[in-house]
Amino acid sequence: MKSKAAVRRIVEELKVLYPNARCSLEYKKDYELLFAVRLSAQCTDARVNMVTPSLYQKFPTLEAFANATYEEVGDAIRSCGFYNTKSKDIVECAKILLEKYGGKVPGTMEELTARPGIGRKTANLILGDVYGQPAYVCDTHCIRITGRLGLTDGSKDPLSVEKQLRAILPPEESNDFCHRLVLFGRDRCTARKANCDSCPLRKDCDYGKAQK
């Protein structure tokens, strides 16, 4: 287990590297983030950001999504892949948000994960970015990098990683920390190469310290 001092150093160093941590998906309304995250499954954020402006122009309200057919939404998101499943989830989710929540995205883990196509990763992102709650978005970058750093035991299971991070991260730092790990994972600590020689986290990184 990392010392509190080591965890704090890692958190602070990432702040220096990425002071403006934010979700890379573009949105203006709470449900737009929810739908964008659904589209991002097996798709890049960059591609999603290319698709969503025209999607939200075609369906400018939650009611428009709820009244659309799966095929209509699917045609608008085709380039994001798996459009048949994603379009169904989006339309059904829009209906539920209107019928049960007055058109607002709910603000609890239990309510969010009960919706079609929403898992803990998406729910954490909504809780953190929309509601400002402590949130632990355990995507592939987070899982890989926290394992290399030694913040977790190296588990590849998102729920296990989330539980371990909840035990060591200051809650108020959690959401931005996970956003910064995404940027760090794209820029420096990639899946193919860790780039330890020039890494500012190396002194506190189990993987980095083991490299010669």
Show which residues each predicted segment covers:
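Catalytic cores of DNA base-excision repair glycosylases
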Residues: 2-212
